[in-house]
Swiss-Prot record:
Major localisation: nucleus
One Pfam family here: RNA_polI_A14
Any one of the GO BP annotations: transcription elongation by RNA polymerase I
Lineage, uppermost ranks: Eukaryota, Fungi, Dikarya, Ascomycota, Taphrinomycotina
Protein name per the record: DNA-directed RNA polymerase I subunit rpa14
Species: Schizosaccharomyces pombe (strain 972 / ATCC 24843) (Fission yeast)
PTM field: Phosphorylated.
Compositional bias annotation for Basic and acidic residues: 87-111, 125-135
Role, per record: DNA-dependent RNA polymerase catalyzes the transcription of DNA into RNA using the four ribonucleoside triphosphates as substrates. Component of RNA polymerase I which synthesizes ribosomal RNA precursors. A14 seems to play a role in the stability of Pol I subunit A43 and association of rrn3 to Pol I.
Record's subunit section: Component of the RNA polymerase I (Pol I) complex consisting of 14 subunits. Part of a Pol I subcomplex consisting of the subunits A14 and A43. Interacts with rpa43.
GO cellular component: nucleolus; RNA polymerase I complex
UniProtKB keywords: DNA-directed RNA polymerase, Nucleus, Phosphoprotein, Transcription
Annotated segments matching region Disordered: 71-147
Low complexity bias (residue ranges): 74-84
Amino acid sequence: MATECPPKMILRKSEKLDKDASSKFLNRYIQTIERFQDEKSGSESVLSQLNRVLMYLKGEEIPLISLNLPVQGPPTEELIIPPEEMLETKEEESLKHAREENDDLHLDKETKKRLKKEKKKAARREKEEARKAKADTTQGVGEKEQS
């Protein structure tokens, strides 16, 4: 369903408006936009937002927004960690990573290159071993089927 857009309202004054003039302008705009408001919008509608601004400009008390959502507690499986503990674990992690990075800083360039190559070789060996182990298990299954 296509919704029509409200007509644009142009403010023809270049000077700053005071609260009364602003509220009058906003009130006119709200009246214009009311016809085009979709009542099925997800959260607070544009119209209700504008009405809240108008209430502020008029100096009225603004009610709290209620979304009529059911209040639910956390599921029993969920662990609730206080924010203080969260900060501590993040700091510990960042210190751990900083230590790992700083271990390589004091080494010279050649040593860093050598360590990098050794890490790559070790990773390659692990991959090859995993492939061989996988191939051995698939061959063993194939031989049993032939027997």
